[in-house]
UniProtKB/Swiss-Prot annotation:
Organism field: Bacillus subtilis (strain 168)
Key words of the record: Cell membrane, Membrane, Transmembrane, Transmembrane helix
Transmembrane segments: 9-29, 45-65
Protein name (Swiss-Prot/TrEMBL): Uncharacterized membrane protein YwzB
One Gene Ontology CC term in the entry: plasma membrane
Lipid bilayer topology: Multi-pass membrane protein
Broad class of where this protein is predominantly found: membrane
InterPro entries (UniProt xref): DUF1146
Cellular location(s): Cell membrane
Superkingdom of source: Bacteria
Amino acid sequence: MSVLGQQAAIGIVVHLIFIAVTWWALQAVNIDPLIKKGKVVQARLLMILLTIAIGTAVANFFLDYLNYSQQLPYLF
């Protein structure tokens, strides 16, 4: 398995893990008072999109940090 293939596999797994963790964390937020009557589908879609956005941002931060830490030996 080449290095690029390994990085791609790690990237996919990390994104899925952080999206799942974000979904789990957002379940603690009570958005019921914010939802208008009859707008349940839109609220669920908002939670899904918010989960993907936050999870992807955190995963990108983690992967960037991992990548930068692997490149540090080239500094010296």
